[in-house]
Amino acid sequence: MCGTRVHASVRHCLIGRDARLRDNPPGAGARASFSEYRMPRKRNPSKRKQPVRSVTQEELPLLDLRAADLPPAPPPDTSRPADASVRSTRTIEFLLRALPPGWRDKTRDLLVLVRMDRPIGALLLLWPTWWALWLAADGFPPWKYLIVFTVGVFVMRAAGCAMNDFADRKLDPLVQRTAGRPLAAGRVRPHEAVLTFVVLALIGFALVLAFTNRLTIYLSFAGAALAALYPFSKRYTQLPQVVLGAAFGWGIPMAFAAITNGLPPVCWLLFLGNVLFSTIYDTEYAMVDREDDLRAGAKSTAILFGEADLPILGILMATLLFTLLLVGQRAQLDWPFLVGLGVALLLFAWQLWNMRWRQRDACFAAFRNNNWVGGVVWLGMVVALAMK
């Protein structure tokens, strides 16, 4: 019976083929294909192949995760920091090539300790300081203050990095991105990091003491205290990024004090804007290390915000732009400043879109993109002040 059924099926296929050949002879372009001789096959609808999109662990939002929920971390690379700039590293190697090997290695490690291999942090600190200098001077600031505050930004940022690595010397080896830092990898000793901080802080204080007024000198003590406080804040509060914003933004009241010998309301409005700006980009930075921070027990706004990180970042970005809009209104800045804010809005939108899957590389790219945000705001401010 089974053979009869198979024979009938084959006969049915051949009869159907002959009928099609009569209606469409080969001369008319009809050609029998191999598929016409195959037996009909019934498909099971439940076994149809469905398109499946592979989602990696990095694409999943880290929502309310505990350290026990995370997979084991891969072994870190301690040869150099994972986020070091290749171009800056090559520049350092080129400048140190004439030194003896022992001196060259130690000097390179000290330069990496103070982040000379990664200047993006200094630029993010520089832009708000320049905002304040141009606003306080109502145009191009005096060269003396421009040089003092620009050099001071790099010096105090380097001092803060040395103190940060000293404070995190037990946490950094547990974080993949920071395990290659000189202090975490054992290439620099803790007392050398503290000595580096003291020397750089004294250089910064000497600049303020020699070239500014008494009010600026008083404010510099508060700035040094904030710079030393930030590295330890991540152990006791979920908002270390806010502390960083206050420390990074302290150059704003110092710039107003140096140029105007006062602290007008627009100064504190701009300071608030910088706290928001620093919280935005350092939260994006912390999103890169969120899993490692959970394992190490460190605190950050990225962990605090959880699955609401992107909506909260969007709110902070909108609040920052509104704050800068108020600054422009008080300073009577014209349309070029508004254009700068418009470009900053587009850059913020790109950051949120790029981070939608919360991948490490995307979050780090968004963090670096804030250098352009600070630059376009400053450029709009400069042009608007020049047109007054």
Question: In which residue ranges do the predicted regions lie?
Answer:
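Intramembrane alpha-helical segments
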Residues: 111-112, 181-269, 326, 349-357
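Transit-peptide-like, low-complexity N-terminal presequences
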Residues: 40-112
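Small-residue-rich segments of transmembrane alpha-helices in multi-pass membrane proteins
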Residues: 124-131, 244-257, 304, 368-381
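Membrane-embedded alpha-helical segments that form the functional core of polytopic membrane enzymes
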Residues: 129-130, 134-167, 177, 201-206, ...
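Multi-pass membrane catalytic core of lipid/isoprenoid biosynthesis enzymes
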Residues: 125-126, 148-153, 169-220, 295-335, ...
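Cytosolic, membrane-interface loops and tails of multi-pass inner-membrane proteins
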Residues: 91-108, 161-188, 283-306, 354-362
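Extended hydrophobic alpha-helices typical of membrane-associated regions
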Residues: 108, 322, 326-388
